[in-house]
């Protein structure tokens, strides 16, 4: 179990950087564009697995996002029933849109979403990121009308490895996206969890003690994240 947890964390980290190693040992996939990402097996394999999830309507507390979500061991950190993790390493806003039907099928009680850092990494235009995120929120409200929706801000980073983007450039884009999300959540009457400043140290860096590599969270980061949202899961 411990080995599986470590292996899964390593896979999530590599996936978030645009590197997928099947079984973490053999087949290596690298992508630098959105189109390339959807050609590697990782996304379809996860969706196939998610299709098998079954639950009574209005019982599941669902987390959906990219590698930061996928690496979140919900049962270990939150220690409660009916938790579902639909994180996929490397995923982007368009990927979330493609698989919202899986969320609709489950009709969760609560939905926690965090997505966007990979869109920024792949240099997808901000206008498109915002448009697709707005579609995600609107679609969730229509397809899961009884669910409580929590849009979590994109977290700070310490630059993004494998790109030419400085931390200043990344931080500017993340702040712009978070500002849009905050306004969008007010307009659409859904919850916005502004986690960014809680994870931030001076100059928009992700706090060193919360990360392995400057973008993905370590156990301490997940423990801290859990503390911020636990009260929202227990009511």
What are these regions (language model features)?
Residues 1-62, 74, 234:
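N-terminal secretory targeting modules
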Residues 34-37, 80-93, 121, 214:
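Acidic/histidine-rich helix-loop elements
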Residues 46-49, 92-98:
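N-terminal post-signal-peptidase region of extra-cytosolic proteins
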Residues 63, 83-85, 192:
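Conserved beta-strand scaffold positions in the cores of enzyme catalytic domains, especially
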Residues 64, 70-82, 94-131, 150, ...:
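Oxyanion-hole/transition-state-stabilizing segment in secreted/luminal serine hydrolases
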Residues 100, 133-137, 178:
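Generic structural signal for well-ordered alpha-helices
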Residues 144-148:
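A short helix->loop->beta-strand "cap" motif at the edges of active sites that frequently abuts
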Residues 156-235:
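Catalytic His-Asp segment of secreted/periplasmic serine-dependent ester chemistry enzymes
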């Amino acid at each position: 179990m411990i080995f599986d947890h470590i292996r899964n964390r390593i896979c999530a980290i590599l996936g978030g950087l645009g590197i997928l190693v099947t079984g973490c040992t053999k087949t290596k996939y690298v992508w630098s564009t959105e189109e390339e990402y959807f050609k590697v097996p990782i996304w379809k394999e996860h969706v196939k697995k998610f299709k098998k999830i079954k639950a009574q309507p209005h019982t599941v507390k669902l987390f959906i996002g990219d590698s930061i979500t996928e690496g979140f061991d919900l049962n270990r950190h939150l220690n409660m029933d009916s938790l579902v993790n639909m994180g996929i390493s490397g995923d982007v806003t368009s990927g979330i849109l493609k698989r919202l039907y899986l969320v609709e099928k489950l009709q969760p009680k609560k939905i926690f979403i965090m997505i966007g850092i990979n869109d920024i990494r792949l240099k997808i235009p901000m206008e498109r990121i915002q448009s697709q995120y707005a579609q995600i929120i609107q679609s969730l409200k229509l397809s899961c009308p009884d669910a409580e929706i929590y849009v979590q801000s994109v977290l700070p980073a310490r630059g993004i490895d494998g790109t030419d983007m400085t931390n200043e450039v990344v931080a500017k884009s993340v702040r712009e996206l978070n500002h849009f999300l905050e306004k969008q959540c007010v307009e659409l009457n859904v919850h916005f969890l502004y986690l960014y400043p809680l994870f931030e140290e001076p100059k928009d860096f992700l706090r060193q003690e919360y990360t392995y590599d400057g973008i993905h969270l370590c156990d301490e980061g997940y423990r801290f994240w859990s503390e911020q949202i636990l009260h929202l899961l227990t009511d």
